[in-house]
């Protein structure tokens, strides 16, 4: 059975040709070549690349570059902007992109979170229409994500990071497991999935 890492974030070193949108969490790079070497060392056969928002925001071109170099190793999930009036077309175009396997919706201060937000509803619906799972980042605010899960039953939703807040650096949150019972209550509620990456601290 192939071993697949369900969430890696590729990014090149910060340079004028591909500048970062914000500082790295610690690594100078996580290139395709570096990731393939690391995967080979531990017996991982393939990975789902979630384009790094901190490095490239809504631009998945670096992840696609890595996919095009290693099409037998990777598939790509791109962040999408639910405030974009053309979100339906964005998702449709992404679904037709070689290597595309999902979209990511981030929920946090400054971004839409409300269950009645039209852009969010259109993004979830478009993903279902085109057969794309939605990686939903709602860590630390799982209660904000639950209404979307309940509303969009036709969409495969993947809760990133178990829905638990995992800051890039210490200190560890005082009650990091507080929302786990809420997540476990959804365990038998298909088509929900979760990712469980290692904490960064």
Regions found by a protein language model. Name each.
Residues 1-122, 126, 130, 186:
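Mid-domain alpha/beta scaffold segments of enzyme catalytic cores
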Residues 114-201:
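Catalytic pocket-lining loop regions of alpha/beta-barrel enzymes
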